Amino acid sequence: MLSAPHGVEHTRAGRVKPAEVQTSDLARDLHRSLHCPVIIKTKSNDDDPNYDEHSPYRDALVDYVKKNDARVVFDLHQLSSEREAAFILGTADGKNLRDDITLSTLCRKDLGIGAVLVDEVFKASGPNTVAASTAKRADVSCIQIEINSKYLCKDFPEYAYDRIRDALEECITSLNSNFADHVYD
């Protein structure tokens, strides 16, 4: 399952933060090609689903995951173009993972566009983050995936949206295959 909680402007501690529109686009594109479930924040309610103590967005995500037996949630975010890393994967030092298949599948993919960091800067460890809250409440693997904006926005020469989409598509397909191989009756 894919999550894009910052698809619209959001308010964190009284400060309006810009929308991460490309994460919504990415989630929609992956839904179209893979038919995987998505949740995308489409209306600004002066809130931040990845920060506020109470969040209807997180509640809806947890409810969906529980009712539909989702195995993994990728929580998509955009990283500032000023950062060096191409990706930062937040797992709360592995606490948000229920298996080791998910992280190894993600980290195995070499995009050839920049560094992939794990649990540096954005660990997704705060109790009100989408990843930590969903992992705990729904007992599911959940990874916060921070993608550098310079690879998602056409304004940058490093633009590589199609490669990122294709890599995530390949990763999701691989995870589905791995989980199917590990189902026991």
Model-found features: residue ranges?
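N-terminal catalytic or cofactor-binding beta/alpha core of small enzyme domains
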Residues: 1-151, 155-185
